[in-house]
């Protein structure tokens, strides 16, 4: 079973990672191609392409200029500890034991606009490139054209050898669209997180993002081996609702006080 999660815009390069080992991203060469395309844009061009403020555009132009084809401990950090958004707050990697981090390394894939797909301990250099960015490239008009077949093929490689391969999708729609479902040789199970608000259960973005990370945390703590094991998810008040679920769409709900 392989869990898919999205990256985060926020990055943390101030605090050291608690694990020394890190790997090189599988699609490093392809990421280098995209960096080459991004370097063709000045600050104004990046601001327009990504709808960024001038300071953020300047920051990322500097990041692209500094990007190295050889990630090291000095210019990078394991992705699991570098990403710092809501999903990663829920996952709480810094609180996991070494064996639990190793479990995450083997059972989680992080989708990325720049790197395509990452293992959690792959060396991540600072960047910003969302999957929905319309960056023209030799394969098409956007990053979906650039990545789609490659990502699915890589996920198939990671799932090779499993008798009944399952992908648990915890990524956003923007990122999961980069996976070519026609090429993916696995059952896909979607997890949906809803909170009670205004007299109905609704997906509330902040809570849902955090819950996706909590689900990865739960799976690591319990070494989950099948979707059935995820039905016991109970972190921060969520509970599986069988009546609202379908075989490949697991719904978790909660009512906050």
Swiss-Prot record:
Pfam families (UniProt xref): H2O2_YaaD
GO CC annotation: cytosol
GO biological process entries: response to hydroperoxide
UniProt-listed InterPro entries: YaaA
Similarity-based family: Belongs to the UPF0246 family.
Disulfide bridge partners, by residue number: none
NCBIfam families according to UniProt: PRK02101.1-3 (NF002542)
HAMAP family (alphabetical): UPF0246
UniProt-recorded name of the protein: UPF0246 protein Mpe_A2092
């Amino acid at each position: 079973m392989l869990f898919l999660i999205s990256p985060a815009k926020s990055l943390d390069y101030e605090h050291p990672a608690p694990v020394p080992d890190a790997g090189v991203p599988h699609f490093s060469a392809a990421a280098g191609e995209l960096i080459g395309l991004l370097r063709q844009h000045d600050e104004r061009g990046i601001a327009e392409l990504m709808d960024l403020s001038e300071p953020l555009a300047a920051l990322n132009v500097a990041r692209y200029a500094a990007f190295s084809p050889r990630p090291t401990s000095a210019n990078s950090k394991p992705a699991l500890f570098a990403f710092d958004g809501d999903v990663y707050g829920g996952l709480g990697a810094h609180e996991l034991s070494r064996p639990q981090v190793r479990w995450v390394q083997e059972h989680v894939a992080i989708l990325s606009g720049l790197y395509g797909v990452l293992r959690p301990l792959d060396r991540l250099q600072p960047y910003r490139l969302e999957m929905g960015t319309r960056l023209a490239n030799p394969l098409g008009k956007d990053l979906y054209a650039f990545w789609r077949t490659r990502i699915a093929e890589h996920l198939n490689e990671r799932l090779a050898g499993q008798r009944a391969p399952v992908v648990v999708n915890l990524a956003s729609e923007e990122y999961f669209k980069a996976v070519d479902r026609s090429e993916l040789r696995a059952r896909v199970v979607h997890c949906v997180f809803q909170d009670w608000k205004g007299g109905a259960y609704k997906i509330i973005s902040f809570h849902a993002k955090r819950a996706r990370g909590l689900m990865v945390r739960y799976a690591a703590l319990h070494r989950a081996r099948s979707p059935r094991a995820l039905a016991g998810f109970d972190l921060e008040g969520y509970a599986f609702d069988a009546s609202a679920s379908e075989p490949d769409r697991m719904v978790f709900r909660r009512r906050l006080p």
